[in-house]
Amino acid sequence: EAETATKSCSGRQANQVSLPKQPASQPRGDPTGPKESKKKVETETETDPVN
């Protein structure tokens, strides 16, 4: 279990470094990143009167 905890910490740091690199490598995705994507969804939901 201790190994898993250490791996989680390392994975988190690697993810933070990979995040900005991923959108640049994947043009089909949002180049702004997942954070911007979430904001977009929130705005769309607020603007949608059906929702």
Curated annotation (Swiss-Prot):
Its main location: host cell. Residues 1-51 are annotated as: Disordered. GO terms for molecular function: metal ion binding; RNA binding. A motif (Cell attachment site) lies at residues 28-30. It is found in: Host nucleus, Host nucleolus; Host cytoplasm; Secreted. Acetylation by EP300, CREBBP, GCN5L2/GCN5 and PCAF regulates the transactivation activity of Tat. Phosphorylated by EIF2AK2 on serine and threonine residues adjacent to the basic region important for TAR RNA binding and function. Phosphorylation of Tat by EIF2AK2 is dependent on the prior activation of EIF2AK2 by dsRNA. There is a cross-link at K21 (Glycyl lysine isopeptide (Lys-Gly) (interchain with G-Cter in ubiquitin)). Residues 33-43 have a biased composition (Basic and acidic residues). Keywords: Acetylation, Activator, AIDS, Apoptosis, Host cytoplasm, Host nucleus, Host-virus interaction, Isopeptide bond, Metal-binding, Methylation, Phosphoprotein, RNA-binding, Secreted, Transcription, Transcription regulation, Ubl conjugation, Zinc. One of its GO terms (cellular component) is host cell nucleolus. Residues 1-25 have a biased composition (Polar residues). Belongs to the lentiviruses Tat family. The transactivation domain mediates the interaction with CCNT1, GCN5L2, and MDM2. HIV-1 lineages are divided in three main groups, M (for Major), O (for Outlier), and N (for New, or Non-M, Non-O). The vast majority of strains found worldwide belong to the group M. Group O seems to be endemic to and largely confined to Cameroon and neighboring countries in West Central Africa, where these viruses represent a small minority of HIV-1 strains. The group N is represented by a limited number of isolates from Cameroonian persons. The group M is further subdivided in 9 clades or subtypes (A to D, F to H, J and K). Transcriptional activator that increases RNA Pol II processivity, thereby increasing the level of full-length viral transcripts. Recognizes a hairpin structure at the 5'-LTR of the nascent viral mRNAs referred to as the transactivation responsive RNA element (TAR) and recruits the cyclin T1-CDK9 complex (P-TEFb complex) that will in turn hyperphosphorylate the RNA polymerase II to allow efficient elongation. The CDK9 component of P-TEFb and other Tat-activated kinases hyperphosphorylate the C-terminus of RNA Pol II that becomes stabilized and much more processive. Interacts with host CCNT1. Associates with the P-TEFb complex composed at least of Tat, P-TEFb (CDK9 and CCNT1), TAR RNA, RNA Pol II. Recruits the HATs CREBBP, TAF1/TFIID, EP300, PCAF and GCN5L2. Interacts with host KAT5/Tip60; this interaction targets the latter to degradation. Interacts with the host deacetylase SIRT1. Interacts with host capping enzyme RNGTT; this interaction stimulates RNGTT. Binds to host KDR, and to the host integrins ITGAV/ITGB3 and ITGA5/ITGB1. Interacts with host KPNB1/importin beta-1 without previous binding to KPNA1/importin alpha-1. Interacts with EIF2AK2. This is Protein Tat.
